[in-house]
């Protein structure tokens, strides 16, 4: 990598070409000794914690999703990396789970990192050197939002030219954000 890091990735989906193609619940993370990883980044599935899922009267069982997050926290505790990060939409219910309350975090907007939609995101982390850019709001609009207008809302786009690339962008992390975090971690 540009900064001299060897990158390992883990995902359950082959299309992301991970280093380890496995379910994190089944991954033998103790194959590496504590301290092996300098930085850990986790992007758990956001669908289960989505605020939209909680608008219906039916209560969603979060046991499986919570177990996945607890597994991530277990892995972070085992490796005790210099820096760790876990992201999820700021509007979701992950932040309300008892095991997340009290963990340090920064809220950021993806539009401040080059994307043309806002996607307010909470990043729990232990990096005191990183604060993230100021949120996009009154008196501090990004270049993608002009006064008295709104950002593009990808949630309602279902078909048409460019939708696939937009969806892939929607589930990705802005490269400018990753660059900022890595620079603050060296």
Regions found by a protein language model. Name each.
Residues 1-186:
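Conserved active-site and SAM-binding loop architecture
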């Amino acid at each position: 990598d540009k900064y001299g890091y060897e990158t390992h990735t883990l995902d359950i989906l082959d299309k992301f070409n991970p280093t380890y193609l496995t379910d994190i619940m089944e991954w033998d993370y103790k194959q590496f000794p504590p301290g092996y990883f300098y930085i850990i980044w986790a992007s758990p599935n956001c669908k289960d914690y989505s605020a939209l899922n909680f608008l219906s009267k039916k209560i969603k069982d979060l046991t499986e999703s919570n177990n996945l997050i607890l597994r991530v926290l277990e892995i972070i505790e085992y490796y005790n990396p210099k820096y760790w990060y876990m992201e999820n939409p700021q509007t979701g219910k992950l932040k309300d789970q008892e095991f997340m309350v009290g963990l340090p975090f920064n809220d950021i907007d993806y539009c401040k990192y080059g994307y043309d939609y806002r996607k307010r995101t909470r990043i729990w982390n232990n990096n005191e050197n990183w604060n993230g850019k100021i949120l996009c709001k009154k008196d501090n609009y990004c270049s993608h939002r002009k006064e008295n207008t709104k950002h593009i809302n990808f949630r309602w786009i279902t078909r048409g030219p460019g939708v696939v690339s937009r969806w892939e962008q929607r589930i990705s992390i802005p490269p400018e954000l990753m660059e900022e975090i890595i620079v603050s971690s060296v």
